[in-house]
A protein has these predicted regions:
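Short Pro-Cys-Gly-centered "Cys-loop" motif that presents a nucleophilic cysteine in a tight turn
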Residues: 1-59, 67-273
């Protein structure tokens, strides 16, 4: 059976992402691993041009709320800067020297193609997650005597309308450690935007104003981990028609849901999204 195509907009959009460790194993325990995940998350996001609105890293899974910006042409100098962020200065210098040799030899087309291969990985949800998870898997396997895949299949994604839907998801993400009874308050958990913002993390604090983390999120919402589209009725209706092939051509009627005090609408979930 062919896997379902992922719902992705070609314009600026917000997404709720969840990815689990294979076999639900608790392989992400410990501060060293979680700190590394957060560092790699922001490096992959910078490389991809993605804005991390919120995150939480648990022992066997993580949640993200991200904004993928409009597609735009990225200058060569910016591509090279991002290569250094993701791969380090040594790799960046290698790329610069290689480009200089190609250009000195008059191979401008080959030099442009090399930059384009990196550029094509930027500004895209799937490429961002591929970069992030592959880099993390390589690091984990090398440092923790692990072999094979680290993750349980594809990540799940929920397309969000900016506004109440994003705010609700941010609140849900921040309250994960509270629901798991690890901490009493969301801001007491270090490996989330809520906790990092309290520790004066400027990147994390950008998403904190959206936080609605309170007792409304003390119950687990399965609907948020099944994928699809969430927002106002008009938003969900419009996009469910646009992405009708993702629903096997069947008309999908948005169903009302109440999340974090907000009245929203959702499509039916896509388990393999």
């Amino acid at each position: 059976m062919a896997r379902q195509r992922r719902i992705k907009l070609e314009r600026s959009a917000y997404y709720h992402i969840i990815s689990r460790v294979a076999n639900k194993a608790f392989l992400l325990e410990g501060s060293e691993i979680k700190n590394t995940i957060v560092r790699m998350l922001y490096r992959a996001a910078d490389f991809s041009g993605i804005h991390v609105v919120s995150y939480v890293v648990m022992d066997n899974h993580f949640h993200l709320c991200i904004e993928v910006p409009d597609k735009k042409d990225i200058p060569k100098e910016e591509v090279i800067r991002r290569i250094g962020i993701l791969y380090g200065d040594e790799k960046k210098d290698q790329v610069i020297r290689h480009l200089e040799r190609l250009e000195e030899a008059g191979s401008f087309l080959e030099a442009n193609l090399k930059i384009d291969r990196y550029r094509s990985r930027m500004g895209d949800l799937s490429e961002f997650m591929k970069t992030f998870k592959q880099r993390l898997t390589q690091w984990f396997n090398m440092n923790h005597h692990h072999e094979g895949t680290l993750w349980d299949g594809r990540f799940k994604s929920l397309l969000l309308e900016n506004g109440p839907a994003v705010k609700a998801v941010v609140g849900y993400i921040h309250m994960n450690p509270v629901r798991a009874k690890i901490v009493e308050k969301a801001e007491d958990y270090p490996w989330s935007t809520a906790g990092a913002a309290v520790q004066s993390d400027k990147e994390a604090s950008k998403g904190l104003s959206l936080d609605v983390a309170d007792k409304r999120w003390l119950t687990r919402e399965r609907k948020l981990i099944q994928g699809g589209i969430m927002g106002s009725q008009a938003f969900v209706e419009e996009l469910s028609i646009h992405f009708k092939d993702n629903f096997h051509g069947v008309h999908v009627s948005p169903r009302p849901v109440r999340l974090g005090g907000s009245n929203l609408y959702m499509t039916h979930g896509q388990r393999s999204a």
